[in-house]
């Protein structure tokens, strides 16, 4: 199965080699037929501490690195594709 790639905004860079990325998704409510926005925060591994709060980051699934981190940030510029 291919690894998922998500895009979101960095909301925290306080941890060493860790960023928290908020990913927002939209869907149509089945009863109200209205577009609903939902967001989820993912802890992602940032080896070089390159991302800062407010920047848009792309994250990819990986093997678990810690209790909360199962995602890695892709390098800036989009050079690396999985």
From Swiss-Prot:
InterPro entries: NA-bd_OB-fold, Ribosomal_uS17, Ribosomal_uS17_bact/chlr. The gene is rpsQ. Signal peptide: none annotated. One of the primary rRNA binding proteins, it binds specifically to the 5'-end of 16S ribosomal RNA. This is Small ribosomal subunit protein uS17. It comes from Phenylobacterium zucineum (strain HLK1). Belongs to the universal ribosomal protein uS17 family. GO terms for biological process: translation. Keywords: Ribonucleoprotein, Ribosomal protein, RNA-binding, rRNA-binding. One of its GO terms (cellular component) is cytosolic small ribosomal subunit.
